[in-house]
Amino acid sequence: MRVAVFDCDGFHKKFWSPVVKFPTPLIEGKLIKRYKRFLSDIELPNGDVVVAHCPNTGSMKRCQQDGARVWLSKSDNPKRKLAYTWELVEVDAQYLACINTGYPNKLVGEAISNGVVKELAEYPEQKAEVKYGEKSRIDWLLTGNDGRKCYVEVKSVTLLEEDGLGYFPDAVTDRGRKHLYELAKMVEEGHRAVMFFCVSHTGINSVTPAAHIDKKYAQAFVEVVKKGVEVIAYQVAIDSQEMKVVRSVPVVMPTLLD
């Protein structure tokens, strides 16, 4: 098992292993409701209802059905206002999705460092959360032996609507569109730029921009791909102990209608 150490541009050094494990054994529960974006009421197996932190600012479309099975982590830190964090949800009574948006960047960093992502092999230097563009941070900045840089923006995909096809975004995102144009700018400056869809839903077999949800994002996606921004997607294997990036899945270009 190889462990890489990265100097993360202002962050503490982080240790990555081939598998991202949850910090504590997860606790199964039942979702009562999500509210105020960051809060959720969860019923535990003993019947107690706890308020858990929901680490996801998105709409979580199809991933927050009342009554769904969910899995929580519990912190022993007495300074935390909420001891529980919502990590996973069962979708359509058969798939698992990771709703904690703090994990995709870690998963992708682990996959790159361990050679799982063949498209991003042979970049000996990796830095996380590096400032670039207009008041933005790139998720991963890779540097090759020749000094050429590769900018990698990571997006988590959890919206499944039909036949294994996953959609991003699950709500209108001006910020996401801005990230696309910033990647295109890096290409114009002579660098490599990659949009990396981290498929955090076990039922998703391919990914496409959600033109029916955010047409402007889909239009920008098509535009920047024509300018040289690369797009790749990898699926994550998920269970209640750990997660890991396992395989490449196709990216389908959107159909844009007037």
Curated annotation (Swiss-Prot):
Indicate the segments annotated as coiled coil, or none if absent: none
What the entry lists under InterPro entries is as follows: SfsA (IPR005224), SfsA_C (IPR040452), SfsA_N (IPR041465)
GO MF annotations, alphabetized = DNA binding
Pfam families, per database record: SfsA (PF03749), SfsA_N (PF17746)
What family is this protein classified in? Belongs to the SfsA family.
UniProt name for this protein: Sugar fermentation stimulation protein homolog
Q: Which organism is it from?
A: Marinomonas sp. (strain MWYL1)
